[in-house]
Protein backbone atom coordinates (compact mmCIF):
# COMPACT_ATOMS: atom_id res chain seq x y z
CA UNK A 1 0.00 0.00 0.00
CA UNK A 2 2.83 2.44 0.89
CA UNK A 3 5.52 1.06 -1.42
CA UNK A 4 7.89 0.36 1.46
CA UNK A 5 10.25 -2.59 1.32
CA UNK A 6 11.71 -4.57 4.19
CA UNK A 7 15.27 -5.75 3.66
CA UNK A 8 16.24 -8.31 6.31
CA UNK A 9 19.97 -8.26 7.09
CA UNK A 10 21.92 -11.49 7.18
CA UNK A 11 23.16 -11.47 10.75
CA UNK A 12 25.29 -14.20 12.27
CA UNK A 13 22.45 -16.69 12.51
CA UNK A 14 21.00 -16.96 9.00
CA UNK A 15 22.42 -18.95 6.12
CA UNK A 16 21.75 -17.98 2.53
CA UNK A 17 19.34 -20.90 2.28
CA UNK A 18 17.45 -19.66 5.37
CA UNK A 19 16.96 -16.23 3.82
CA UNK A 20 16.15 -17.66 0.40
CA UNK A 21 13.42 -19.80 1.94
CA UNK A 22 12.03 -16.74 3.76
CA UNK A 23 11.91 -14.68 0.56
CA UNK A 24 10.39 -17.48 -1.50
CA UNK A 25 7.81 -18.27 1.18
CA UNK A 26 6.73 -14.65 1.62
CA UNK A 27 6.81 -14.12 -2.16
CA UNK A 28 6.54 -10.32 -2.08
CA UNK A 29 8.36 -7.67 -4.09
CA UNK A 30 8.50 -5.72 -0.82
CA UNK A 31 10.54 -8.34 1.06
CA UNK A 32 14.24 -8.69 0.37
CA UNK A 33 17.71 -8.86 1.79
CA UNK A 34 20.33 -6.45 3.06
CA UNK A 35 23.54 -8.31 2.28
CA UNK A 36 26.23 -7.78 4.91
CA UNK A 37 29.41 -8.91 3.18
CA UNK A 38 31.19 -9.79 6.43
CA UNK A 39 28.41 -11.48 8.38
CA UNK A 40 28.33 -14.39 5.93
CA UNK A 41 31.58 -15.64 7.50
CA UNK A 42 29.76 -16.37 10.76
CA UNK A 43 27.63 -19.02 9.06
CA UNK A 44 30.50 -20.70 7.18
CA UNK A 45 29.69 -19.25 3.78
CA UNK A 46 31.66 -16.94 1.52
CA UNK A 47 30.37 -13.62 0.22
CA UNK A 48 30.18 -14.26 -3.54
CA UNK A 49 28.30 -17.55 -3.20
CA UNK A 50 26.01 -16.05 -0.57
CA UNK A 51 25.22 -13.06 -2.78
CA UNK A 52 24.70 -15.24 -5.84
CA UNK A 53 22.09 -17.38 -4.11
CA UNK A 54 20.20 -14.30 -2.87
CA UNK A 55 20.76 -12.04 -5.89
CA UNK A 56 17.08 -11.79 -6.95
CA UNK A 57 16.20 -10.48 -3.48
CA UNK A 58 19.04 -8.03 -2.77
CA UNK A 59 17.86 -4.54 -1.85
CA UNK A 60 20.83 -3.09 0.04
CA UNK A 61 24.49 -3.93 0.72
CA UNK A 62 26.63 -3.34 3.81
CA UNK A 63 30.30 -3.38 2.85
CA UNK A 64 32.24 -5.02 5.67
CA UNK A 65 35.53 -6.91 5.76
CA UNK A 66 37.13 -9.25 8.27
CA UNK A 67 40.38 -11.06 8.89
CA UNK A 68 40.27 -14.67 10.09
CA UNK A 69 42.14 -15.85 13.18
CA UNK A 70 42.15 -19.54 14.19
CA UNK A 71 41.24 -20.74 17.69
CA UNK A 72 40.92 -24.14 19.31
CA UNK A 73 37.13 -23.89 18.96
CA UNK A 74 36.99 -22.49 15.42
CA UNK A 75 38.04 -18.97 14.49
CA UNK A 76 37.56 -15.31 15.20
CA UNK A 77 36.52 -12.82 12.57
CA UNK A 78 38.07 -9.44 13.25
CA UNK A 79 36.97 -6.26 11.53
CA UNK A 80 39.38 -4.39 9.34
CA UNK A 81 39.45 -1.70 6.68
CA UNK A 82 37.78 -2.72 3.43
CA UNK A 83 40.29 -4.51 1.22
CA UNK A 84 42.43 -5.69 4.15
CA UNK A 85 40.43 -8.84 4.87
CA UNK A 86 39.03 -11.82 3.02
CA UNK A 87 36.15 -10.29 1.03
CA UNK A 88 36.85 -10.14 -2.72
CA UNK A 89 35.20 -6.77 -3.27
CA UNK A 90 36.11 -6.27 -6.96
CA UNK A 91 34.45 -9.54 -8.01
CA UNK A 92 31.59 -9.28 -5.52
CA UNK A 93 30.68 -5.72 -6.46
CA UNK A 94 30.96 -6.45 -10.19
CA UNK A 95 28.50 -9.30 -9.71
CA UNK A 96 26.09 -7.19 -7.68
CA UNK A 97 26.32 -4.22 -10.06
CA UNK A 98 25.59 -6.50 -13.03
CA UNK A 99 22.23 -7.43 -11.49
CA UNK A 100 21.48 -4.33 -9.38
CA UNK A 101 23.39 -1.33 -10.79
CA UNK A 102 21.52 1.17 -8.59
CA UNK A 103 21.57 -0.74 -5.31
CA UNK A 104 22.56 1.24 -2.22
CA UNK A 105 25.92 0.27 -0.73
CA UNK A 106 27.16 1.56 2.61
CA UNK A 107 30.42 1.12 4.49
CA UNK A 108 29.80 -0.67 7.76
CA UNK A 109 33.07 -1.17 9.57
CA UNK A 110 31.60 -3.78 11.82
CA UNK A 111 31.72 -4.94 15.37
CA UNK A 112 34.20 -3.35 17.75
CA UNK A 113 34.78 -6.80 19.27
CA UNK A 114 35.85 -9.89 17.38
CA UNK A 115 33.22 -12.54 16.76
CA UNK A 116 34.12 -16.05 17.79
CA UNK A 117 32.74 -18.63 15.35
CA UNK A 118 32.89 -21.87 17.33
CA UNK A 119 32.46 -24.19 14.36
CA UNK A 120 34.46 -26.97 16.04
CA UNK A 121 32.02 -27.19 18.95
CA UNK A 122 28.89 -29.34 18.91
CA UNK A 123 26.63 -26.54 20.16
CA UNK A 124 27.46 -24.40 17.09
CA UNK A 125 25.87 -27.02 14.84
CA UNK A 126 22.70 -27.21 16.95
CA UNK A 127 21.79 -23.85 15.39
CA UNK A 128 22.23 -25.25 11.86
CA UNK A 129 20.97 -28.85 11.92
CA UNK A 130 20.24 -29.14 8.20
CA UNK A 131 23.41 -27.62 6.71
CA UNK A 132 24.50 -28.84 3.31
CA UNK A 133 28.23 -29.50 3.41
CA UNK A 134 28.88 -28.39 -0.17
CA UNK A 135 27.50 -24.94 0.73
CA UNK A 136 30.44 -24.59 3.12
CA UNK A 137 33.26 -25.67 0.77
CA UNK A 138 33.88 -22.19 -0.71
CA UNK A 139 34.07 -20.85 2.85
CA UNK A 140 36.64 -23.47 3.77
CA UNK A 141 38.77 -22.55 0.75
CA UNK A 142 38.50 -18.88 1.71
CA UNK A 143 39.38 -19.73 5.31
CA UNK A 144 42.46 -21.81 4.52
CA UNK A 145 43.72 -19.34 1.90
CA UNK A 146 43.47 -16.39 4.31
CA UNK A 147 43.81 -17.61 7.88
CA UNK A 148 46.18 -15.49 9.95
CA UNK A 149 48.98 -16.90 12.13
CA UNK A 150 47.65 -18.35 15.38
CA UNK A 151 49.95 -16.15 17.48
CA UNK A 152 48.98 -12.86 15.77
CA UNK A 153 47.35 -10.35 18.13
CA UNK A 154 43.80 -10.04 16.82
CA UNK A 155 42.47 -7.63 19.43
CA UNK A 156 41.18 -4.24 18.33
CA UNK A 157 41.92 -1.08 20.31
CA UNK A 158 38.40 -1.47 21.74
CA UNK A 159 39.27 -4.91 23.11
CA UNK A 160 42.53 -3.57 24.54
CA UNK A 161 40.62 -0.79 26.36
CA UNK A 162 42.64 1.93 24.64
CA UNK A 163 42.07 5.62 25.39
CA UNK A 164 39.26 7.48 23.63
CA UNK A 165 41.64 9.38 21.35
CA UNK A 166 43.22 6.08 20.22
CA UNK A 167 39.76 4.67 19.48
CA UNK A 168 38.77 7.79 17.53
CA UNK A 169 41.97 7.63 15.47
CA UNK A 170 41.40 3.92 14.81
CA UNK A 171 37.82 4.46 13.64
CA UNK A 172 38.82 7.40 11.43
CA UNK A 173 41.77 5.51 9.93
CA UNK A 174 39.69 2.44 9.08
CA UNK A 175 37.00 4.57 7.47
CA UNK A 176 39.47 6.65 5.46
CA UNK A 177 41.34 3.52 4.33
CA UNK A 178 38.05 1.93 3.30
CA UNK A 179 37.02 4.95 1.24
CA UNK A 180 40.47 5.07 -0.39
CA UNK A 181 40.21 1.36 -1.20
CA UNK A 182 36.78 1.77 -2.80
CA UNK A 183 38.08 4.72 -4.84
CA UNK A 184 41.05 2.59 -5.89
CA UNK A 185 38.82 -0.16 -7.27
CA UNK A 186 36.51 2.34 -8.97
CA UNK A 187 33.48 2.05 -6.71
CA UNK A 188 33.48 5.64 -5.43
Give the residues covered by each predicted segment.
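Short, acidic/turn-prone active-site loops that include or flank metal/cofactor-
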Residues: 35-39
